[in-house]
């Protein structure tokens, strides 16, 4: 018989981190559409901006599955979508002057340097999310930077946990 590691500590960490990831996803799913809808007063927030190919592909797939019905599109988009729209190249086109509506406690929200740091943190948190989603429990050890990024994002969102 192959010896199995004791998973209880890893599963406890997994559960806590997964819930924190959910907080970020829920907040982004709510705040991004609300913020982008105010730009042109269009309730279909995703029509106001030219996203790169991957986010556009995801939106088109959701609309196709829903037979063109745009209601609730945001609830069907994966975590990767929300991370991708905060890519560094989207700062001036989409987020400059608006990022504080999403992350109200982000220090120096109009700074390009701050935005670049935010984008990197979101990418690292996305990698952490994928490790959890694919049950890479062994890889969850020594993820201190990703956990710090996760907590930074939650604080920047102004969410109390």
Identify what each model region corresponds to:
Residues 1-161:
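Amphipathic alpha-helical interface elements
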């Amino acid at each position: 018989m192959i010896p199995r590691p004791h998973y209880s500590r890893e599963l406890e960490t997994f559960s806590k981190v997964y819930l924190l990831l959910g907080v970020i996803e829920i907040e982004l799913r709510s705040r991004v559409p609300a913020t982008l809808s105010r730009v042109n007063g269009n309730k279909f927030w995703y029509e106001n901006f030219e996203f790169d190919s991957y986010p556009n592909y995801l939106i088109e797939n959701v609309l196709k599955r829903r037979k063109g019905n745009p209601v609730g599109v945001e609830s069907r988009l994966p975590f990767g979508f929300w991370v991708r729209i905060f890519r560094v190249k989207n700062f001036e086109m989409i987020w400059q002057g608006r990022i504080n509506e999403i992350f109200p406690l982000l220090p120096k929200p109009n700074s390009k340097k701050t935005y670049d740091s935010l984008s990197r943190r979101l990418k690292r948190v996305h990698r952490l999310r994928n490790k959890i989603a694919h049950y890479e429990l062994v890889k969850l050890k020594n993820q201190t930077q990703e956990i710090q990024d996760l907590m930074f994002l939650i604080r920047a969102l102004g969410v109390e946990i």
